[in-house]
């Protein structure tokens, strides 16, 4: 068995990635989220495949086909709610995974980090297009509002929006192409994940201390396979609780009304995992400025390695930086809350303050505090 594992051309790749992989001996539970993201991706592809067997990408039948899945298909409601709530779990793991990278300085592994940012953008695009497919009120108006943002691009904006729509409004052509993209993107994500892992295994994993772990490595299996399995069980528990007890908790009631282009919902908002970016978009009165802030709110992650001024890679022994990190987390919670509120006083002001704080923390406060900590440690 060992000979096959180590000599077979295909199995030896698996062996060097998941069995005999040398891993740091001190990586904590925050490192579990990579494998949990892999599990979420597998769940989304499998449930999505079964949903695609029954779904019809047509404006007249899309809404009723989703109803048909929930009512007439064997365990269709379980598949549908696993897919919808699985997306929420996916993003929860994704945000924690990125947060861990920030906290422990994993962004110094620049290739892995940059592929991760591309993955984040791709997953967000996939989730947005998936939200349009049930063709409820929020699906239709969400698609209209978000795609319309591209019209802010000078000169080519309007033409670009109509090209994406496939007409002069969100209609059948838009739904069909969104379904096609929503189907293909998870496979592109899987390919990107492989590249992500390839670069990670080139350098080896980071660890909580942020120091080289070459002198102290342990095999990935059985130690971290068991640890990842425990993480998976702890992820399945809340997911199943959501699916079986409160499947619509994270959804919008407006999406149970079929799409009607003649009736605008009182408050258009995306799913919870986009609310922080949506709040940043809304906090700027100018359309182009809002779109740029929205894109930069994610793209800012790409310049974090350039803003690293600390002599220590990890924040583990940098209490001031830790304090700023948790202020950033609280700020993101505030932005998420604001994104779900109507555009009125005092929410507008809170949103603007939270948006300014978000960019100030990353661009100014964190690099400055890191320099202060270097001085305190006489480095």
From Swiss-Prot:
Pfam families reported for this sequence: Cytochrom_B_C (PF00032), Cytochrome_B (PF00033)
Positions that bind a ubiquinone: 201
Transmembrane segments: 33-53, 77-98, 113-133, 178-198, 226-246, 288-308, 320-340, 347-367
Note on cofactor: Binds 2 heme b groups non-covalently.
Molecular-function GO term, any one: ubiquinol-cytochrome-c reductase activity
Annotated InterPro entries: Cyt_b/b6_C (IPR005798), Cyt_b/b6_C_sf (IPR036150), Cyt_b/b6_N (IPR005797), Cytb/b6-like_sf (IPR027387), Cytochrome_b (IPR030689), Cytochrome_b_C_euk/bac (IPR048260), Cytochrome_b_N_euk/bac (IPR048259), Di-haem_cyt_TM (IPR016174)
Protein name (Swiss-Prot/TrEMBL): Cytochrome b
Organism per entry: Propithecus tattersalli
Gene: MT-CYB
